């Protein structure tokens, strides 16, 4: 097979569009793009095209937006493209075995973690949430399971102490395309070596929800601090003060300890709002009150000191 592959790309959000952009700058030929149907977005709820569709149209690439691949028509449409390979990145749709078998070389997926550590929908967030030292991307040959296919390439990077899901997303959006292009070179040259996953090492990275992001002050301070970073930019760690929901944008673990009940404010000054937890003290450094942008603790205390007096019990 020649070094240039005929590729069908399947993806939807900005993360996927960055991988498509890398493909468009490579020696490979993107013959078609699959993406989710246009969805209502914004306050006006007008139909909005996914980022992948926008990029494909800019390059005059045919775009397909089936609701599913259940129909024979959708499957035949893909078969008629005569692709060597399908590259799938955050597509948001399950692919049946018939689709996985259609391209000559099958389908590969770029997954936002080091497999098999985190399979599922929220691997970036869960890696921070769990306190992992590193994360990365895994490119795998897709099978019918959930992120269970043989691994073709892994690229890693450290998780820094200040990384949030937002910052890690940006890093992986740069790492992923590089790894993909390297992997495609191996596939085109017949040098790709599939490695089976060890199922015993697998965890499921379940989706996040707003209820999970509510701070439980009985948890360890270190765990709460990781949650603050993992749940940024969504759903945002939060708690209640003076019957208002307060979002936490930045925090750190204090060196000091406290014997006060979990959730008690033990210190409040320009260095932060210090809150006793189940183990250790958490320092709140940047907060967002309803109707306002995120603010430093000093600005918060200048305007709402009564909400955060020492001895106040946060819930």
From Swiss-Prot:
InterPro entries: Fmt, Formyl_trans_C, Formyl_trans_C_sf, Formyl_transf_N, Formyl_transf_N_sf, Formyl_transferase-like_C_sf, GART_AS, Met-tRNA-FMT_C. Keywords: Protein biosynthesis, Transferase. Its EC number is 2.1.2.9. It is an enzyme of class 2 (transferase). (6S)-5,6,7,8-tetrahydrofolate binds at residues 113-116. It holds the Pfam family Formyl_trans_N. Gene3D superfamilies: Formyl transferase, C-terminal domain, Formyl transferase, N-terminal domain. It catalyses: L-methionyl-tRNA(fMet) + (6R)-10-formyltetrahydrofolate = N-formyl-L-methionyl-tRNA(fMet) + (6S)-5,6,7,8-tetrahydrofolate + H(+). One of its GO terms (cellular component) is cytosol. GO terms for molecular function: methionyl-tRNA formyltransferase activity. Belongs to the Fmt family. NCBIfam families: fmt (TIGR00460). Attaches a formyl group to the free amino group of methionyl-tRNA(fMet). The formyl group appears to play a dual role in the initiator identity of N-formylmethionyl-tRNA by promoting its recognition by IF2 and preventing the misappropriation of this tRNA by the elongation apparatus. This is Methionyl-tRNA formyltransferase. The gene is fmt.
